[in-house]
Amino acid sequence: MRKGKKFISAALGFALVFQSFAGIGPVAVAATGDVDINSTFTDANFRSYVSSNFDTNKDGTLSEKEIDAVTSLNVSISTYSKKISSLAGVDVFTSLEYLDCSGQAIGSLDVADLENLKSINASSDQLTTFTLPKKAEQLASVNLSYNQITDITFQTTYAALKELNVYGNQLTSIDLSKLPALVRLNVGYNALSVLDLSKNTNLEFLHCQSMTKLQTLDISSNSADHTKLAYVDCSHMLSGGQGAIKELDVTGDTGLKTLIADDNSIDVLNMDGATSLLTLSVAGNKIKSIDVSK
């Protein structure tokens, strides 16, 4: 037994001496839950931002405490001037509530696991794909304007989402039925042929300009209650030609105060019961007469 102990001690001693001469030094092992910054954040500029702002003890890793402390992340081009092409690794910040990466060069963004998000601003990011949180009970605002997104899927009900801006993308369809709290919606400059707002009865502001394939826009209160709707702009703003909208129905929308639908192909305008209307602009359409007496 003594010989065995001596052999083990000698072996350990040799290992320590060898390590010392090899210049290896103590082996750093990250504690459970810690995140290595270099291997996790692949974009050099994003990695630099994370290191500077969140690695408080400058040890090259993010501890659970450091990660949990991150509730806001702003790398918008107006705030952080360095270009970022990927936010890979952002999913480690599970306490994140506010994310602004607008104006960057991010082709794809996946925030599926960030369930505490309240606000997302990823406008003007060159996005082609975007994945929403799988669950986000507090998510109130999403801005994805000026990208190249072709599809957006709301996999669950986002009961707190009040503002959605997807202006200037390449969407051909969008299902808004899981956004019951929506107050402000901007879907302008997309290729939507159908816009179903029957489940969005809290909607107050609607922007759907230059919809080149949308022929019928029914936002009446006939089949759904749209009495909260106060502002609608479905004008055609592209140079040359007219918009595709032929029929516009705002019947029964008693809260509607402003309706702008210039330069479309409208020949049928139903607005019976829109008794609060103060501003009506429908120039450049095919309407022969308008009855505003009802």
Where are these regions (language model features)?
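Short, intrinsically disordered, charge-balanced linker/junction segments flanking boundaries
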Residues: 288-294
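Short glycine/acidic-rich loop motifs that flank beta-strands on beta-rich extracellular proteins
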Residues: 127-128, 149-150, 171, 192-193, ...
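Serine/threonine-enriched low-complexity regions in disordered or flexible coil/loop segments
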Residues: 81, 211, 237-238, 242
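A generic tandem-repeat structural signature
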Residues: 114-124, 131-136, 143-145
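Conserved hydrophobic beta-strand positions in leucine-rich repeat
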Residues: 73-77, 99-101, 120-122, 140-144, ...
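N-terminal capping/linker segments that flank leucine-rich repeat
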Residues: 2-12, 16-98, 115, 137, ...
